[in-house]
């Protein structure tokens, strides 16, 4: 380790320095925000939880997928979709006390933590598994194209998510904010249950590829 560190001393030095700068900025922002008499934590700050949960939970999922309890691909997709829906259920439940048309409201930060946890669990069932099956199931000459289509579908999904989010005021004014998030909970849960029902048929179409 010492020889490797000395060989890449300059790069390691600047890498370590960059981490010190980043964490210095983070600590300064936290001190400036929380040091006030009234503190507000922006929801965007919680996005770091996704990376944290991935780092902590990815080894666990890797162990499960390598064990005898490894489910089939369609079942993994179904579980991932249901976990995604459960994450939105936490947000829907947490927003029950927010009246329709409210401009501001305060809720427990734990609802966002739970939501990010279950969304990350769902992501770990979907994203790496999907990429793996693209490489396994696509014809060899089309693997690059299929990976491109997979990433393109993610880009389209992000665009549609932005468009859908723009309707939050119109929908929440009619059925409340909890009703708006309940839609995003029920749709993926329903899709996950459909994946369970189609598991046998999809496995036959995979011709024994696991």
Positions of PLM-derived features:
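Glycine-rich segments within core transmembrane alpha-helices of 12-TM secondary carriers
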Residues: 47-54, 147-162
